[in-house]
């Protein structure tokens, strides 16, 4: 197994670290990075782009010829990461000994943490994995260009739990948007803007998905509560006459016993 450790920093720092760790060739231009790998350990490509509002997107397509554990410094308490797997699988854990969450083909994951603990990705020998990452930094709200999007992401996804990794099926519309993102080839500022709009659209869909799920859960809970209340009312209405009748019978029975006893004593 090969263990690789990356320091936290800008996307440029991360790609420089990957270049050194994997003996790769890095090309960068206008906040875009392209890393080509062809060694005894890995073969493939990693591409990344960063936007002015604290959002970074990364696409990975790699074949591993050995097991690899890639450990990265803590994401930071204000970071949110969305992961989307398109081919095969990989695993995520907080720390090397933390719980392993498998992110499979056509599945996605939400990752955030409010503790200083490394984020670890686990890759397996003789597998070709394809996945996309979208990292959102919400710590600079107020200074960023698109405050409302970052604010809503922070409000919706930053969890108060120490470490959080949720995995589930991909949203089909988001998967289609990611495919479209990969087809954008316009150079320079035009391509940059098109890619930014596409990624922001994906993030808005993530917010809507989460909000809709919470609303459905709330409706379900409310319906369940109303149903239980109605059932209790039915039970009460069913039991009530029997309860009153039973009490009345006990009172009358006691009263009759007293009268009979008094009559016998007098005679």
Residue ranges of predicted features:
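Short hydrophobic beta-strand segments that form the core of ligand-binding sensory/regulatory domains
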Residues: 59-61, 81-85, 130-137
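Glycine- and acidic-residue-biased ligand/ion/polar-headgroup-sensing regions
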Residues: 76-98
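Beta-strand elements of well-folded, non-transmembrane domains
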Residues: 64-66, 88, 138
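N-terminal low-complexity or simple alpha-helical regulatory segments
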Residues: 1-76
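Alpha-helical bundle regulatory/interaction domains
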Residues: 5, 93-222, 226, 236-237, ...
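Basic/polar phosphate-binding segments, predominantly the helix-turn-helix DNA-binding elements
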Residues: 205, 237-267
């Amino acid at each position: 197994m090969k263990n690789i450790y990356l320091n936290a920093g800008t996307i440029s720092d991360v790609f420089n670290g990957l270049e050194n760790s994997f003996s790769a060739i890095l090309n960068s231009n206008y906040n875009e990075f392209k890393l080509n790998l062809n060694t005894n350990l890995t073969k493939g490509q990693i591409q990344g782009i960063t936007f002015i509002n604290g959002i970074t997107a990364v696409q990975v397509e790699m074949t591993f010829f050995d097991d690899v554990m890639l450990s990265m410094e803590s994401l930071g308490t204000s970071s949110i990461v969305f992961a989307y797997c398109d081919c095969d699988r990989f695993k995520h854990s907080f720390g090397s000994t933390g719980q392993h969450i498998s992110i499979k083909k056509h599945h996605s994951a939400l990752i955030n943490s409010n503790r200083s603990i490394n984020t670890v990705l686990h890759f397996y020998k003789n597998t070709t994995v394809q996945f996309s990452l979208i990292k959102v930094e919400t710590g600079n709200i107020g200074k960023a260009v698109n405050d409302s999007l970052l604010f809503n992401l922070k409000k919706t996804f930053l969890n108060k739990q120490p470490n959080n990794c949720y995995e589930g099926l991909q949203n089909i519309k988001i998967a289609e948007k990611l495919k479209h993102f990969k087809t954008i080839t316009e150079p320079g500022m035009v391509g940059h803007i098109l890619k930014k709009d596409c990624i922001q659209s994906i993030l808005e869909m993530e917010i809507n998905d989460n909000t809709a799920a919470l609303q459905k859960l709330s409706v379900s809970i409310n319906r369940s509560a109303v149903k239980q209340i109605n059932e209790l009312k039915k039970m009460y209405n069913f039991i009530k006459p029997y309860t009153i009748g039973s009490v009345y019978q006990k009172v009358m029975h006691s009263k009759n016993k007293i009268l009979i006893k008094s009559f016998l004593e007098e005679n």
